[in-house]
């Protein structure tokens, strides 16, 4: 079971509270987790990744085990602590202002 923490605006869109728990078939990668997340919550399609390119949207970052995974390849394995469910994958929305 993989745990995912979404930013507040995406939790509201998906109508979830707190962490999301997902079953991921195969290796635990960013792509596999996001595929499972979008399959379970279709309203999130296009909000985390671009529809066509499947690249991370510019103002979102991925963190796990105190590491920024935002620039890791989408098929790179996630840390073991995330794959085992001990630690969550954090999807963080940027805060900007002027």
Region spans (language model):
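Ubiquitin-like/PB1-type beta-grasp interaction modules and other compact soluble beta-rich domains
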Residues: 1-97
